Amino acid sequence: MAGPGTAAAALLPAVLLAVLAPWAGRGGAAPTAPNGTLEAELERRWESLVARSLLAGLPVAAQPKEAAVQSGAGDYLLGIKRLRRLYCNVGIGFHLQVLPDGRIGGVHADTSDSLLELSPVERGVVSIFGVASRFFVAMSSRGRLYGSPFFTDECRFREILLPNNYNAYECDRHPGMFIALSKNGKAKKGNRVSPTMKVTHFLPRL
């Protein structure tokens, strides 16, 4: 079985392409990094990408925090993250929150527990991470939402844009199950809802 070094080497051409592409389109040579050589800049970006891959199996508390920036073109390769609150317009209106003990529910006000980090896992699939609690949003095979200190397959959610410009989040590991909040702000079981129901509609807010 190939080790981390083999996987890292296999990804190097893609990383080089992403770094050099902006200058290639202008027909010019890539400039050197302000604080060193171009090689040093490439190495820095490469190490950052590999570190995120290798740390995926560690508890999040052991992983370094990284600044989140707004998503744009090329985010899927470089792992660009978005800081958002996910607002569900049910009842009095609730933001999805991840509590320090790993419980997941809704809260009406903007709180530190409702600040989430959305990171692309692959095109159309994201992880949802509680910035304050340091837990990932995850969904079990029975549709129960829970906070996971590790990133696992149950932490992958397919981000679906709906006709009303809200998003639905379908568990990638358990298709047909969606993140949902009740009119009282409680987490609903993902296997008892559908994207046609308002309880599954979330609006990402800054």
Swiss-Prot record:
Disulfide bonds: none annotated. It comes from Bos taurus (Bovine). Pfam families: FGF (PF00167). GO terms for molecular function: fibroblast growth factor receptor binding; growth factor activity. Residues 1-29 form the signal peptide. It comes from the Eukaryota. Belongs to the heparin-binding growth factors family. Its main location: secreted. SUPFAM superfamilies: Cytokine. GO terms for biological process: fibroblast growth factor receptor signaling pathway; neurogenesis; positive regulation of cell division; positive regulation of cell population proliferation; positive regulation of MAPK cascade; regulation of cell migration. SMART domains: FGF. Plays an important role in the regulation of embryonic development, cell proliferation, and cell differentiation. Required for normal limb and cardiac valve development during embryogenesis. May play a role in embryonic molar tooth bud development via inducing the expression of MSX1, MSX2 and MSX1-mediated expression of SDC1 in dental mesenchyme cells. InterPro entries: Fibroblast_GF_fam, IL1/FGF. This is Fibroblast growth factor 4. Interacts with FGFR1, FGFR2, FGFR3 and FGFR4. Affinity between fibroblast growth factors (FGFs) and their receptors is increased by heparan sulfate glycosaminoglycans that function as coreceptors.
